[in-house]
């Protein structure tokens, strides 16, 4: 059985509430509850400490998105609104915003090189069919050349549910390193400085 078949039957597995809700020294959990207008997007900044980037070992950034669109059980496209996310690194927010903004078909889209778009598993083709999406970017080498800020782009795309003008959603991000390094305090300080 392949990963897609297992996920289709079992979902993302059994929840560990404590693991999902709390951080520890080498694993940080961040979340936001928000809403987006149809055919709009939001960019969330994710601080990535130097210690996480350069310390040897396996490190992951896991993004999970959940939303509650109107549904019809009698349609092939049963979900009335589509949502998706991407994890981008090494780019300025202005370039990301320009890339994802809605534009006329004849207008060129500024490119974001593949090296700046984090490869996540499962990929977008598999996960975007669902109202609960989760994917992980895994890094094994030094990633400091991409900078200390990554960005999560959350998009909301109108479907057949024309009576809806905004869609609620929640997003959770887990930043984790297999080495027992102190990233919680570093991320917390950077978030408090912004707040």
Region locations from a protein language model:
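Generic intrinsically disordered, low-complexity segments enriched for polar/acidic and small residues
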Residues: 9, 19, 28, 97, ...
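C-terminal edge strands of extracellular/lumenal beta-sandwich accessory domains
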Residues: 79-93, 138-195
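Secreted peptidase-domain scaffold signal
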Residues: 8-95
């Amino acid at each position: 059985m392949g990963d897609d078949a297992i996920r289709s039957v079992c979902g993302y597995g059994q929840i560990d509430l404590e693991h999902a809700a709390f951080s520890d020294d080498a694993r940080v959990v961040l979340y936001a509850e928000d809403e987006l207008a149809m055919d709009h997007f939001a960019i969330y900044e994710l601080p990535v400490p130097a210690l996480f980037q350069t310390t040897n070992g396996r490190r992951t950034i896991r993004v999970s998105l959940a939303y509650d669109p109107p549904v019809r059980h009698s349609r092939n496209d049963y979900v009335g609104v589509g949502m998706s996310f991407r994890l981008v690194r090494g780019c300025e927010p202005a370039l990301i915003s320009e890339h994802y903004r809605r534009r006329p078909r004849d207008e060129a889209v500024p490119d974001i090189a593949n090296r700046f778009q984090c490869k996540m598993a499962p990929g977008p083709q598999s996960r975007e069919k669902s109202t609960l999406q989760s994917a992980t970017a895994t890094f094994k080498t030094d990633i400091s050349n991409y900078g200390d800020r990554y960005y999560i782009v959350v998009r909301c795309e109108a479907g057949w549910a024309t009576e809806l003008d905004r869609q609620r959603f929640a997003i959770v991000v887990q930043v984790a390193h297999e080495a027992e390094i102190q990233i919680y305090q570093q991320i917390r300080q950077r978030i408090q400085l912004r707040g």
